[in-house]
């Protein structure tokens, strides 16, 4: 079994490419993680997700603790076996979903008490419980429990939230069961305030996490402000540890973030957009529902290797999506995930060659 490690093989300005070694295989970085929130990437077979080029996918503590429960998944052999995915899995701590989905939530020093958005049942999620759930799931990369600071927020509110996240990070770190090839990442907060981001990073770096995530971005602040934060926040983190920008996945955002030193990304954009009939291509986005595609006998992209492009026309995809056929969601999602993995692969190649990349400026 491989030890968890991160080796940077190439660097161009602030952009890095390398390999994360884990108990479940290697992750090429920069890496884009498809989101498999409930133990599945919507409208995709796990083996099909791997065929798009994904080295790792994301699962979610909040959703899996509610259905079918972490204990049941553990009894059935863990999340990898449960969903037939033998590559690395990173699990979100559940904090963001508790804040965004649950009603009647109450945040205390202990954790967050909340009602399930499914049936109203009462739950308590603490740093210790979140870490234990991720252990039961068998997550390759466990995320520390945090409070995702909303936007807009005052300096004092952001400071209070960041300090709570730091205290929770201590408890998450203490609760983590170390195993060879497995890792735990801390999450820095601080909203758009440089002083708070630096304080947060300093507190977490002292805990010697295996990697670090930048949370609390892509929550409404806009690209310009997000990039402003990314101009300084990665510099507060160790050079030899992976850096993960949570919830960010627009192509232009990925490119801008890699140029600022980010190594890992996740986002629902390619899958959600695919199910809604939007395709990403090198020529821009295509809304396949548009009537102008009803008689278009060309593929979405001529040089794309995905089944949607090699076997079907825009007219057929238009038909499937317009009538709500499941195959339409499957093909559009497959295409988008292939596009995103091809994009990230091109970025890795440009870094290796020492070339600037700005495909979406």
Curated annotation (Swiss-Prot):
Keywords, in A-Z order: Glycosyltransferase, Metal-binding, Queuosine biosynthesis, Transferase, tRNA processing, Zinc
Recorded catalytic activity of this chain's protein: 7-aminomethyl-7-carbaguanine + guanosine(34) in tRNA = 7-aminomethyl-7-carbaguanosine(34) in tRNA + guanine
Family of this protein: Belongs to the queuine tRNA-ribosyltransferase family.
Pfam families, alphabetized: TGT (PF01702)
Enzyme kind, highest EC tier: transferase
Pathway: tRNA modification; tRNA-queuosine biosynthesis
GO terms of biological process kind: queuosine biosynthetic process; tRNA wobble guanine modification; tRNA-guanine transglycosylation
GO CC entries: cytoplasm
Protein name: Queuine tRNA-ribosyltransferase
Function: Catalyzes the base-exchange of a guanine (G) residue with the queuine precursor 7-aminomethyl-7-deazaguanine (PreQ1) at position 34 (anticodon wobble position) in tRNAs with GU(N) anticodons (tRNA-Asp, -Asn, -His and -Tyr). Catalysis occurs through a double-displacement mechanism. The nucleophile active site attacks the C1' of nucleotide 34 to detach the guanine base from the RNA, forming a covalent enzyme-RNA intermediate. The proton acceptor active site deprotonates the incoming PreQ1, allowing a nucleophilic attack on the C1' of the ribose to form the product.
Cysteine pairs bridged by disulfides in the record: none
Binding site for Zn(2+): 304, 306, 309, 335
Residues passing through the membrane, by range: none
Organism: Rickettsia akari (strain Hartford)
Name of the encoding gene: tgt
Assembly mode: Homodimer. Within each dimer, one monomer is responsible for RNA recognition and catalysis, while the other monomer binds to the replacement base PreQ1.
Co-factor binding details: Binds 1 zinc ion per subunit.
Binding site for substrate: 92-96, 146, 189, 216
């Amino acid at each position: 079994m491989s030890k968890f490690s991160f080796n940077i093989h190439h660097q161009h300005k602030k952009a890095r490419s390398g390999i994360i070694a884990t108990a479940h295989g290697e992750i090429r970085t920069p890496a884009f993680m498809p989101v498999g929130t409930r133990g599945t990437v919507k409208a995709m077979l796990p083996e099909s997700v791997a065929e798009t080029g994904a080295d790792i996918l994301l699962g979610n503590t909040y959703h899996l603790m509610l259905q079918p429960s972490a204990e049941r998944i553990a009894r059935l052999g863990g999340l990898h076996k449960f969903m037939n995915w033998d590559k690395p899995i990173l699990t979100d701590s559940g904090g963001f979903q508790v804040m965004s989905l649950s009603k009647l939530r109450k945040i205390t020093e202990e954790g967050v008490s909340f009602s399930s958005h499914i049936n109203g049942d009462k739950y308590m999620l603490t740093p210790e419980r979140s870490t234990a759930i991720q252990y039961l799931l068998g997550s390759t990369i466990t995320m520390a429990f945090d409070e995702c600071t909303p936007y807009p927020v005052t300096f004092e509110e952001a400071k209070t939230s960041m300090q709570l996240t730091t205290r929770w990070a201590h408890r998450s770190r203490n609760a983590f069961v170390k195993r060879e090839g497995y890792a735990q990442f801390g999450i820095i907060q601080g909203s758009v305030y440089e002083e708070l981001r630096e304080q947060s990073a300093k507190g977490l770096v002292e805990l010697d996490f295996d990697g670090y995530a930048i949370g609390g971005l892509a929550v409404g602040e806009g690209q310009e402000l997000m990039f402003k934060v990314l101009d300084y926040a990665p510099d507060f983190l160790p050079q030899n540890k992976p850096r993960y920008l949570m919830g960010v996945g627009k192509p232009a955002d990925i490119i801008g973030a890699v140029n600022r030193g980010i190594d890992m990304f996740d986002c629902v954009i390619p899958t959600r957009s695919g199910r809604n009939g939007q395709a990403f291509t090198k020529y821009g986005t295509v809304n396949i529902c548009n009537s102008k595609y009803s008689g278009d006998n060309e593929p979405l992209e001529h040089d794309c290797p995905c089944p949607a492009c090699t076997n079907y026309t825009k007219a057929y995809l238009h038909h499937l999506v317009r009538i709500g056929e499941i195959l339409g969601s499957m093909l559009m999602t497959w295409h988008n995930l292939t596009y995103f993995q091809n994009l990230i692969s091109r970025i890795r190649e440009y870094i290796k060659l020492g070339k600037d990349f700005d495909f979406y400026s």
